[in-house]
């Protein structure tokens, strides 16, 4: 239902901006997956087939598909607005219902906990004598079983720990390789851009600020161990920022172009890794 609401919102914007009755499936998917609400809720990205199924269900016998574009027939903008409000109200009712249900379960859980505690208190005295008697009578037989259990448990525990440890090591190694590939791809692509290369090399000539030179040494970046993607992006962002420091105001436009190239590269590699 929530996907339905989001798709209608994107569809409404696309049709309103294009002033036609056609909309690209790719633009619908991109608009949906880049939507602020979608990113905030962290739901899964939508696929083309999902979009087609939802469109057919919401607009039966009103669409046709040709060359990756959906054409809408006899569709008015206010019709989409009405559908958006209808889905919004259904979502609202659904959420209110879920909250009411959760509230009842919480109240029921508290009452059950109180009654359970009271019954345990009444039964504790009567059960203690019988349990101690049975413990004495079964002592000899239980001793052997307990000894076996105690001896076998550490072995099983050690085996489980070893397996978990090897899985964690494998995942760390795999993640490290992916991050290194990301780092190499980003730097290689950035080196092909003229503006970024000029900004990057400009502060290498600045002798009075060793900190800037060390933080932005390209050779150092190529061997940088990444904990996450933000580490690399932060270092590259420093490059553009420090480029302004070393150039002054005359080359601000060039630095802004370099910033655009950086943003484009980061998005390019992220999309490549996502797909």
Swiss-Prot record:
Location(s) in or outside the cell: Nucleus
Record region (Disordered): 107-169
Keywords noted in UniProt: Chromatin regulator, DNA damage, DNA repair, Nucleus, Transcription, Transcription regulation
GO BP: chromatin organization; DNA repair
GO-annotated cellular components: nucleus
Low complexity composition-biased segments: 115-166
Keyword hit for Ribosomal protein: no
Subunit structure as annotated in this protein's UniProt entry: Component of the NuA4 histone acetyltransferase complex.
Described purpose of this protein according to its UniProt entry: Component of the NuA4 histone acetyltransferase complex which is involved in transcriptional activation of selected genes principally by acetylation of nucleosomal histone H4 and H2A. The NuA4 complex is also involved in DNA repair.
Family: Belongs to the EAF5 family.
UniProt-recorded name of the protein: Chromatin modification-related protein EAF5
Record gene name: EAF5
